[in-house]
Amino acid sequence: MDLALFFRNEVKPALGCTEPGAVAYAASIAARHCPGEPLSVALSLSLSMFKNGRDVGIPGTGGLRGNRLAAVLGVLAGDADKGLMALEHIDMAVVERAQTLLDAGMVTEEVVDGVPGVYAAVTLRCAGHEVTVTVAGRHDRVASIVVDGEVVGGEGMERAPEADGTLHGGASCEPSASFTEPPLPAYLEELRECDFAQLWDMAAGIDATLEQELLRGAAMNMAVARMGLESGWGLGVGHTLAAHAEAADLHARIRFMAGAAADVRMAGAPQPVMSSAGSGNHGITATVPVAVAAEGLGVSPRVQAEALALSHLVTGYLKAHTGRLTPICGCSVAAGAGAAAGIVKVLGGNAVQAERAVASLMASLMGMLCDGAKGSCGLKVATAAGEAYAAALLGMDDRGVQRPEGVVNPDIATTARALARLSREGFAAADAVMVELLGGGKH
């Protein structure tokens, strides 16, 4: 597998929550194709995009929240060239104008069925023109750009089969058209076929350039964690836990540092984090526990980098099975599993111990629901970080899950398949109910 390609696409900086970031990105592209004053913006979102963007803070807005705000900010001042960081340079004057347009009812939002988990169609109307930009499959993947009914760009979508079983590809200007998940990139297909020993060996084989990039990403996320400790952003999970912890307690430090970083991100601080598998909170969970353990135990930068690589690879492996956005909390289950494996590497363990740690983590947290991105994600991230360390200790002592326990198996491939089926089939109804509880009708 091309490791450089994996890390370039799966581990990269993101500003704010990636769901409203994707909405803002699509809106900023739409604005390029729609001259004049905006008249209306309509959002058509998947269940997951709706719930993950509903209550999360938007960076640079003073704590304002939501996909609708992200969309109108993207239209007014988004920089499409910056992708998921399209709102990096907005100011309060733009925010005030955006709020005025929101209050006037300019933006509508609806949840649509039959689309991939990552799906947002932004339809912008201005004088004499209508533009629909759709992102799908990945947060920064532009599937289609449709201007006045004509497809002018985008990578295309995979249509769901017709009644006769035929498939039709290509872009559509219908936001509610039925589509399937786009195929995985080749590098993720390769990753899905790996066993754990191969993941372990790949992490050990990173080159000097990847080593430096991984350490840079960890430093970025640790800086965000320290912000959370100093000022108590959001729910103040990390700040509060730190105030009641012994400084020498590594387990507690792993928990409060990870929680603090998520506090900052969910509150909408204008500070980028290094993401993993398309999610900033996944990136925090995959990196901060490993970095804190490495710092506390005084291991070499090389060991830390290999541990970070393993964490991202395990996270990516599990997400390649489940999909980008799921009813199960991927920060806890996928990135938490990655962190457990990475911490075993920091502790000097081997591949067998790391795979057992992954199984133990998943046995603990597999049922944790994702009810959207919001301040309380800090609680889940802190829990996942703490459980990752506990699972790593069990692995190092050759304890934990060593035979099938419920739906969890010591073999990562078997458990990944079970997780994927539970997420896609078992928890699908739960996702729909959660969105109803969150008010996911058109408004």
Swiss-Prot record:
- Which HAMAP family does its entry note? UPF0597
* Transmembrane residue ranges: none
Its recorded name reads: UPF0597 protein Dvul_2496
Q: Where is this region: Disordered?
A: 156-178
UniProt record similarity statement: Belongs to the UPF0597 family.
Q: List the disulfide bonds.
A: none
Q: Which InterPro entries match?
A: Ser_deHydtase-like_asu, UPF0597
Single GO biological process annotation from the record:
L-cysteine catabolic process to pyruvate
* A single MF term (Gene Ontology): L-cysteine desulfhydrase activity
Q: Which domain of life is it from?
A: Bacteria
One Pfam family, short name please?
Answer: SDH_alpha
